[in-house]
Amino acid sequence: MGYTIIWTDKSRKNLEKIPKDTAARIIERVEIIRGDPFLHIDRLAGSSWYKYRVGRYRVILDIKRKTLVIYVIKVGQRKVVYRNLE
């Protein structure tokens, strides 16, 4: 049984600002990690969140192991995605 993926409002808005072909690729790649996300992600330094690399873009994730849920927190280019993370 795989994880459930929940896109936050902020991550959906981030996707709208990205070119459609790139956004589709990001969505497709996030769906791929549903089975076992820990094979593909790295822990975000100084945080309980994780990062997932998709080309020049990064996807910030919050993973709840007990409930098998992946929250997509933020999506953006590497140079700006790490700003203002809370």
Question: What do these predicted regions represent?
Answer:
Residues M1-G2, R12-K13, R29-I33:
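Short hydrophobic/aromatic-rich motifs at helix boundaries and adjacent loops
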Residues E28-R53:
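A short, surface-exposed loop/turn module that caps and links secondary-structure elements
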Residues T4, T8, I41-D42:
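A short, glycine- and basic residue-enriched loop/turn
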Residues G2-I6, K13, K17-A24, V54, ...:
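Enriched for short, Lys/Arg-rich terminal
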